[in-house]
Amino acid sequence: MNPIVFSTILTTAIMGTMIVMTSSHWLMIWIGFEMNLLAIIPILMKKFNPRAMEAATKYFLTQATASMLLMMAIIINLMFSSQWTITKIFNPTASIIMTSALIMKLGLSPFHFWVPEVTQGIPLVSGLILLTWQKLAPMSVLYQIAPSINLDMLMTSALLSILVGGWGGLNQTQLRKIMAYSSIAHMGWMTAILTYNPTMTALNMLIYIMMTLTTFMLFMLNSSTTTLSLSHTWNKTPLITSLILITMLSLGGLPPLSGFIPKWMIIQELTKNDSIILPTSMAIMALLNLYFYMRLTYSTSLTMFPSTNNMKMKWQFENPKRMNFLPTLIIMSTLLLPLTPIMSTLN
């Protein structure tokens, strides 16, 4: 793709998200979503092949359906409230339809079907954008309308997402699909706390983006897309492979790594609000996520058959992929837990 064309498309996608995040007018929010959608399709198909085209088509159809539902909810709300501003959703039907549309855009269960397939069919860079930047716009709208959301619907979707995110990743050997199911589970944790403490949702999103960014950058540095290719990199880049596994354990929420922070704080906040069954169920379901990350780490590092490196002088060549801020991201993705007492004051 021409660099100028790619820069223009990327700028449009960023502008669309920024319009959604900064607008208080429903029509501008819808326009921002459409700008972002039309610009992100060529980014998903940057390396043109049938799989990328299929993934981009699935993404477009899902997001277009969600946008249609969103506009329907906006019009219903306009009929009852006679205003375009995001203050309160006055009609229960509009609230349910709007929540469904935003859940579909985020890839939460039961509308999660597109996330693993789309992520698997696109390159690692596009997958990184899809699982991080593309979550910001719908989550910012959910953040703004949190007081008007149907609580039962949101909690059901959150619990299902945590369950699907853990259950779906159990049999996967593709790293991109594992990251997709991890994303579904993390989105479930964020929406579970949204109505109780929106600030904690924002903090959870920040930590999730940081960990996902680190993991994808390490995948790109190591050129790994499957668990088999990851296990074969031990004798070539043992340090990077070890860091990938530690970061993935952090994504699973293993203490004392950074990924444990959001789970700890969310369970604590839900318990403060006299909710016992919900956090208990979430913690049990989160063990599924941690299990497949632990199994991946075990199978990749401890059960690998001894092999020699047949690629001579591999260590003498300088890696052309320069990622200068990766060490900082790795430290923040794994060692933030001591800062939890400070973060707990951000209510």
Swiss-Prot record:
Gene Ontology biological process terms from the UniProt entry:
mitochondrial electron transport, NADH to ubiquinone; mitochondrial respiratory chain complex I assembly
Q: Can you list the GO cellular component terms from the UniProt entry?
A: mitochondrial inner membrane
One example of the protein's molecular function in GO is: NADH dehydrogenase (ubiquinone) activity
- List membrane-spanning regions: 1-21, 25-45, 60-80, 89-109, 111-131, 149-169, 178-198, 201-221, 242-262, 274-294, 323-343
Task: Give me the reactions it catalyses.
Answer: a ubiquinone + NADH + 5 H(+)(in) = a ubiquinol + NAD(+) + 4 H(+)(out)
The enzyme's first-digit EC class, named in words, is translocase
Q: According to its UniProt record, where is this protein located?
A: Mitochondrion inner membrane
Q: What is its EC number?
A: 7.1.1.2
Q: Which domain of life is it from?
A: Eukaryota
> Which keywords does this Swiss-Prot/TrEMBL entry list?
Electron transport, Membrane, Mitochondrion, Mitochondrion inner membrane, NAD, Respiratory chain, Translocase, Transmembrane, Transmembrane helix, Transport, Ubiquinone
- The chain's coiled-coil residues are none
Q: Which InterPro entries match?
A: Complex_I_Subunit_2, NADH_DH_su2_C, NADH_UbQ_OxRdtase_chain2, ND/Mrp_TM
The main location class comes to mitochondrion
How does the UniProt record describe the way this protein sits in the membrane? Multi-pass membrane protein
Q: What does this protein do?
A: Core subunit of the mitochondrial membrane respiratory chain NADH dehydrogenase (Complex I) which catalyzes electron transfer from NADH through the respiratory chain, using ubiquinone as an electron acceptor. Essential for the catalytic activity and assembly of complex I.
The entry sums up its family as follows: Belongs to the complex I subunit 2 family.
- Describe, as the record does, how this protein assembles with itself and its partners: Core subunit of respiratory chain NADH dehydrogenase (Complex I) which is composed of 45 different subunits. Interacts with TMEM242.
Q: What protein is this chain from?
A: NADH-ubiquinone oxidoreductase chain 2
